[in-house]
Design a protein with these regions (language model features):
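Substrate-binding clefts and catalytic carboxylate motifs of secreted carbohydrate-active enzymes
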Residues: 2-7, 11-31, 38, 47-274
Length: 274
């Protein structure tokens, strides 16, 4: 910390305490120590490490912020790593606690390495890192080209900055199957409505929405209205038989339309342009 301060005295210094995974294979180490230790013991084993820091970072330990603030009332905390699926709960803690200044997810953009830590398998168990041909981590709100993934649109709702509802469609070929997702992953969904040969087959649609209620329409026909917004973790869930055409989500407040978004089945290709 002293070295950093000599070179840059203006900005705060942070470092992270990391909760090891339950199956961590580290000799002589209780993998759940940092997460499950009682408050006084945790304070004793971490106090010297955290003392020089301006901001104490915790990785994957949201349950410790409130209890450790009681023991260290003058500390400033930050969630230095969190899992994508925990974004709603994690951000609610930032909004609730003034001593918790932010939440960082692992990770903003996908990357090469730690192959498959964010993968999802269908009707198969997940075990460790993925083998070749996996190369990407498979996590990240943005893909390697910088394009937003569904989880990024969900986070927009959590942050209160979403401009419209997002239609997260589970491909109908996955209906009734179990998606096994790592803690860094996200279910297989896409804002897409083109499944030839699946007409009449059931499909699940999750709408990411900040509104109190969300209505779903297929080809102008109301499928249903479901609660959404923060009390429902910003997700309105629907099931319907697939039919090509237009799928529309409408955000509602007090029964009045706020905004809408539509996805459409494309027509036949007309030509190729180079």
């Amino acid at each position: 910390t002293d070295c950093f301060k000599r070179n840059d005295p203006m900005r705060p210094v942070t470092n992270a305490l990391c909760n090891a995974s339950p199956d961590a294979d580290v000799e002589g180490m209780d993998a759940n120590l940092l997460k499950n230790a009682d408050q006084i013991y945790f304070a004793r084993v971490t106090e010297a490490f955290a003392a020089p820091l301006d901001v104490t970072g915790y990785n994957y330990m949201p349950e410790r912020f409130e209890m450790d603030h009681a023991y260290f009332p003058n500390k400033v905390f930050c969630a230095t790593e969190t899992a994508p699926a925990d974004s709603c709960h994690g951000w609610s803690l930032v909004e609730r606690f003034p001593f918790l200044i932010g939440d960082f997810v692992w990770t903003a953009m996908d990357y090469i390495g730690e192959a498959g830590i964010g993968r999802t398998l269908v009707d198969e168990p997940l075990e460790g890192l993925a083998e070749y041909p996996y190369r990407l981590a498979g996590t990240g709100d943005l893909d390697l080209c910088g394009r937003k993934r569904p989880r990024s649109y969900y986070r927009d709702c959590v942050w209160g900055i979403a401009k419209r509802p997002y239609l997260a469609v589970e491909p109908p070929c996955l209906y009734g199957k179990k998606q096994n997702t790592t803690m860094w992953g996200w279910p297989v969904v896409e804002e897409y409505w083109n499944y030839p040969g699946m007409e009449g087959k059931p499909v699940k649609v999750s709408v990411y929405s900040m509104a109190a209620e969300t209505a779903l329409y297929l080809n102008g026909k109301l499928i249903g209205v479901q609660p959404s917004g923060k009390p429902n973790h910003f997700i309105a869930s629907f099931q319907l038989p697939y039919q090509p055409g237009e799928l529309t989500a409408v955000n509602l407040e007090d029964g009045k339309e706020i905004c809408r978004h539509t996805i459409r089945t494309p027509g036949l290709p007309a030509h190729i342009r180079l």
